[in-house]
Amino acid sequence: MLEKVFHEKSFADQYTYGAKISELYAETLITESGIAKSHQRPLIILDNACGTGSISSTLQRTLDERNKRSLKLTCGDLSEGMVDYTKQRMQAEGWNNAEAKIVNAQDTGLPSDHYTHVYTAFAFNMFPDYKAALRECLRILQPGGTLATSTWKTANWCTIMKPVIATMPGQLSYPTMDEINTMLNKGWDRESDVRAEFEQAGFDHVNITTVEKQCLLPVQEFGEACKILLPYILSKFWTQEQRDQYEADVPSYLMRYLEREYGKDGLAPMKGVAIIASGRKP
């Protein structure tokens, strides 16, 4: 069900509404990867599960000219909608030496011992087989290459749905953030577990940090971001009868709640806490 959600065009459209906070975390992820101090040349980078291209765009904006001249960048995602969006962004922003294509992170088909850096932003908690994806990252990295990941610990665009659902009739349930994280890939919201996954996969020099960020979005845009995982979550927590009776009404209850909290033309805070991890291939 979750993989089906990723392939729907509406997912790519809604995902762009969360791009602002993704851009903020992209800067942190790139900094934590240590790429600015890397002596590896040329820089051969995979933006893995690239989404809307936040990592790649930030790299193009922040790398110095010497690094950009040596850069070879591949943006890969399993969602055709995400790849199309990234291609458009690539052209609009004039990225250097970059390509975007369909890539399955669990079986990439990419060459071994090839990349200096692999970035995977907000995806390891959603891969159907994250251990296979970790093995692939290790395989395709050069010796001394770096994997850098981010995963959500908390995200208020998920948790805000609980009080929204409470305003609806029918005594409907909605999960806490801990329950949502457990529905996805358990453990990627805990620092010690993320470290253990990196080390068990074969990475060394593992660094873990937890970072909180927020940005402001117009209420309408924040409302769209809140709906990103809604079909998947409701499929797990509501009966089919409840979905048939109430699911179509959720967006209107959501907007009424947000407009009451922040005003019809107001700004809503988008808040997240993410685990930033990096590790090196021996």
From Swiss-Prot:
The keyword Zinc-finger does not apply. Coiled coil: none annotated. InterPro entries: Methyltransf_25, SAM-dependent_MTases_sf. One of its GO terms (molecular function) is methyltransferase activity. Specifically expressed in conidia. Keywords: Methyltransferase, S-adenosyl-L-methionine, Transferase. Induction: Expression is positively regulated by the transcription factors brlA and laeA. This is Methyltransferase tpcH. The gene is tpcH. GO terms for biological process: methylation; secondary metabolite biosynthetic process. Methyltransferase; part of the gene cluster that mediates the biosynthesis of trypacidin, a mycotoxin with antiprotozoal activity and that plays a role in the infection process. The pathway begins with the synthesis of atrochrysone thioester by the polyketide synthase (PKS) tpcC. The atrochrysone carboxyl ACP thioesterase tpcB then breaks the thioester bond and releases the atrochrysone carboxylic acid from tpcC. The decarboxylase tpcK converts atrochrysone carboxylic acid to atrochrysone which is further reduced into emodin anthrone. Belongs to the class I-like SAM-binding methyltransferase superfamily. Pathway: Secondary metabolite biosynthesis. It comes from Aspergillus fumigatus (strain ATCC MYA-4609 / CBS 101355 / FGSC A1100 / Af293). Its EC number is 2.1.1.-. It comes from the Eukaryota.
